[in-house]
Swiss-Prot record:
One cellular component (GO) term of this entry: endoplasmic reticulum membrane
Phylogenetic placement of the source organism: Eukaryota, Amoebozoa, Evosea, Eumycetozoa, Dictyostelia
Region (Disordered): 33-83, 305-629, 679-723, 736-817, 1107-1133
DNA-binding region: 40-308
Annotated GO biological process: positive regulation of DNA-templated transcription; protein autoprocessing
TM ranges: 1055-1075
Keyword Transmembrane: yes
Record field: compositional bias (Polar residues): 305-316, 401-417, 453-470, 736-747
Organism of provenance: Dictyostelium discoideum (Social amoeba)
Keyword Transmembrane helix: yes
Biased composition (Pro residues): 757-771
Protein name: Uncharacterized protein DDB_G0292186
Subcellular location field: Membrane
Amino acid sequence: MLGLFNNSNSINGSGNNQDIDEIKREQMSNFDQFEDGLNNNNSNNNNNNNNSNNNNSNNNENINRKTGSTLLSSSTSQLNSSSGQISFSKDAVAPTKKRRYIVDKDHIFSWTPYCKAYWNKLINVYGVELEPPQLNVSAEKGFSFSEVDNSWIYYRRNHFQLGIGVSHCFQFLESSPPLISLNGSIYPVDDFYLCIRGVKNGPDVNINEEVEVELYQTNSKREKGEEKLPPPVLMTFSTNVTIPRLHFRKATANNARKHKLPNPQQEFFRLVLTVVARAQSRDFCITSMISDPLIVRTGHPTCNPVSNNPSTPGTPISNFDSSNNNNSSSSSSIINNNNNGISGYSPHTTVTTNSTTIIPTYGSGNNNNNNNNNNNNSSGNSSSTSPMVGPLGVVFPPSPINSLSNHNSPHLTPIQYNNNNNNSNNNSNNNNNNNNNNNNSNNNNNNSNNNNHQFQSNNRIFKGNLSNPFDLNYSQNSNNNNNNNNNNNNNNNNNNNNNNNNNNNNNNNNNNNNNNNNNNNNNNNNNNNIFSHNNNNNNNNNNNNNNNNNNNNNNNNNNNNNNNNNNNSQNIHFYNNNSNNNNNNNSSSSNNNNNNNNNNNNNNNKNNNNNGNNSQINEKHNLSSNSNSSGFTAELFSSIENTIRNNNFLTQKPHFPFDQTLHQLQFQAQNNQYDQINGKLDNIHNNSNNNSSNNNNSNNNSSNNNSNNNNNNNGSHTASVKRKLSNSYDQQNLEIESPQSYISSPTPYFVDNKQPQPQPQPQPQPQPQPQPQSQSQSQSQSQSQSQSQSQSQSQPIQQIVQQQLSSPTQFSQSEEVILSSPLQQQTIQSIQQQQPQQQVITNPLLQQPQQQQQNIISIGDMDKNIKWAQSPNGGLFHFGNVGVNSENPQEALSVNGNVSISGMMYQPSDKRVKENVKPVNSKDQLSNIMKLKIYDYQLTDEWVKSQNLTETKDRGVLAQDLNTPSNHIPNSVKHTGDRILGNGRVIKDFLVVNKDAIFLENVGATQELSKKVDNVCMELETLDKKKFEMLGHKMSELERTTIREIKKNQKRKKIFIGIGVFTLFVIFGLVAVSIVLGTRNTITKNITVYTTGSPGYLNGDCTDSESGSNSCYDSSSNSAIDTTTSTGSGSIK
């Protein structure tokens, strides 16, 4: 088939002697060859672009074979070529291998969001809204597009299948599952499910007109008896979901066309995909999508209007915007020129070959592939029939014969690729482009959305009281020169590693090589975070090879002062991991000016601005790269512990709490006292916290060691406490920058209205200041000085601790003491546990007797010893009973008056703190509730006035009724002792009622009633069953009786009929017998009639004799009348 279209001499119209069967066999064999050789050649096209000459020739061969078979199968009668004609009948069309997935050229079966108003939001444990799983739907088979109807067609007797790719935007953890917000309540999500249904709607989506239609799923055998509704599919951890063998049971209405045009009253079906979150055994919609309208037909029409390119496309659907993919490869540019304006869609089907599979992208556009494959070295042997290589090696053949295709090149749907690994293949093999370093400039947005799920998307600044619960704002900012996590991989030496190799080979040059490239590289302005993790890696390798004489090498690393200015204004927990590797290798010759070269050693210590840079943060943890995190804080508290133990501070009860003393010591030591001893401890901690390699042969130690603390309060707005440098540390030296300091600082502080009496304090010894050494001193002296500083670092700490122990201070309500870090708190707890309970004070600084001070708060006319403190969570606490409008609180909180609560009241009820747990008999609870009486009452005036009540009428129970043995509810009544009213009246043994106990008793009674109601319902159901059974029995008996009676009546009827018939026969027989007998025996009677003048009877001549009666004489005629009587005849003479 290679020569079928390329070589004009292989087949020449009617002159061809090749048999049709051979052509068919060749076509089928070429299919297998094409399947085997397609992917290997495609992989060579994408990867080995410089050696693409041979691969292009092989691809041309395979593609031309495929083109021949494809075009031959689509032809019906004739093929026109440049050399001749080829005539085939319809029976001679070569069979084409059925492909399951076909890429559509023109049409897109799209899905759009549906019913957004009914979507529920997903949030995490920090209250940040999460994106729901994104779906990429691929209608893999069953649908085809109709040009006439301008709609998608589905035939009811077929089945269709949906392949859904799921892209999870967050990780589902069973330990901390996502939460769903429902009417202000939050529930954990158990699993995610995918549901599908069919709806009836018009061409435009209208939710109000939605009617659900029957959509069924069959088994693999497609048995009608096994049809069922598509069940929900579990998709919690799935990335690919397939819903097979779906079909509509009914066709759409008004499918008939009018005048060969679409019916304006055409009915449409649509598919609806819904992602539900299952929580509390209920399903809640989190996202939903609806498909394009479908026309469901019963059978294929005679003239099929469906296009020749059935498609099963799908677009990536998400309720969140997704960024566009930047495919900058040479093959994609070809495809983009043939899109006819269609762009931004993902593949609609999955193209499967023997070794390569194109999987649709299920992401939200987080990955940007910048494949800079410059294929300018390929040979020019490719002809007009050379195949087009698509993305990922998919080859799409061109159409060499214009009469066989509608377009000269296929119109392919742009394909979006799944690149979760962010692989940027920068194969710049372009000999025509010498700027190879600039080929990586397209990689600016790699990994740009890898951290989409940071916990700071809300960016809410906490401004309320920390005693109230709030959502933590967690952020993990890894700013390795990445603004908004954009890795600018510009290979133009603009990285953090500023390797400034200044090779100065000239004489008398003033090389002021200031490394200004790192000034603002790592300024992490986390103004709204509560937890902040800042990892700043600044590697400044300054290799200044000065090989000439008289060079003034002022290579001052002044830029390091601003490298790590982490302006964390409202951070509560700050973890600062700063690693400043400043390798200053100054190899200068013998003629260099030592005065200028020695400045580099002192500038290395300027990297210590990380130690005190965030002194206003409440809890600071400086973690160095070598895991040496103790630093000054550990040494300070170690000295505090040793001083306290040596002075036997815990011998007796101090004049104020021990924790408060330690808080004051920590506070003063962490502020300006830290500044006083910072000069001596500076060089020591530089070596532990900053990897500074000072390879310098000079000995100049200037006084720039303390310059690193200039940025301690840079850009910080957190309220903090400052102390003035003075010899006495009393209350008057405290200053508060902001009156709202307690808002941003959840550290404990103590309330005290009365200022203590200032005690005479010993003056602290002046701290020795380090003096700069001369330039002529040797390097060994510099090293010995650093060792002496290391040995004497605890001396100023001991002085500070002793000074603080001798000058205890109290704090007022408007002042604030910053608590220590968790490390410091552990140190304090260990000191308290290890100290003996009874010792003797041996500290000479504490020998002076001091009067114990009390924290006094005025409440009405009484003064009570009340000590309030603030917990690390920001709440105030106090040990003892508290009364509101009550001078003598009997409980932890006694309130005289109304209490308004906007939230919920909770009580501890954990099973692990309870013993002897026994169930309560609900029958007894019901009996107690039945005995309980509710009253309407009015409070007395004296009680209302004494308790500051506003309502005098109420409804409730009487404590005396509950205190009787017959009606005893456990823990419902409490005796509170005598109560004195405002008028002096004393109520003996005042009783109060626990309504919670009554409520629980009512719950038990309700349960018992519920049981009884259930029993009654069960009995009623039993009675109903019995009634129905009895009625059934009666009905059946009546039916049987009726049937028996009917049968009896039928028998009687038959008997009566028989008897009647027999009677008739008897009657007729008797009549016949009588007739027969009557004809044989005739009875004759002679009647004589006499005719006289007057009848015998009338004349009186006739007698009463028989003869007289049988004969009469007619007097007129004197004639006798004879009468003969016989049966049936008579005669008269």
